[in-house]
Amino acid sequence: ELLDKLDALRNPKMPTMLLGGLEYKMDQDGIPLKIRNVIYEYNSKGLTPLYTKKLLPNYDIFDEQKYFSAGSENSIYNFQGKSFGLLICEDMWMSSMHTTDPVKELFEEVQEKNIQLDGVINLSASPFYLGKDKTRLIRASEISQLFGCPFIYTNRVGGEDEILFDGSSFVVNGAQITHRAKFYQEDVLSYQLEAFSGELDQKKALNDKVNS
């Protein structure tokens, strides 16, 4: 339903968005064989899958391994001259319950390819509990300092049955909280990056050459 509404607004000038959603692989009878938790790029061309969640929590209220298939690939998302690492929710929380560490794997790839990320983006639907906000901020700061770039955390807001999602999305740069959304309310944050100047620099160089 949401995508139908978005498709109705789709046009060549629409902004590019990153959306969290599910990807289904069906059998011939229409029964899901695999369900993946995915980050999509959505723009005037439609939906493009970018990244599949690697860590599937299977504790407390979570039973994701029963329903979902895990991803195995890192994702470095390039957009208008900027590079971003992508993570989904649990991927930022390596623990003894998991055999892989998506943050470490992403870091190793950017080091190997000599890439300086402009940000690490995490799309989350993270339930609230007492002390969770402080724990998130500490972990976000660790990741930001590891990569030397802002950590952009976006969280679901609202309720589902007895589960509460507190929103409170934020941007952390090093040890500093630079942007903060409201708790338990829908909110919009605007975070500006330096514009990519490559195309303008090329045009300027060409103009200088023509006019010299």
Residue positions per predicted region:
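Enzyme catalytic cores with a strong preference for nitrogen-chemistry domains
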Residues: 1-212
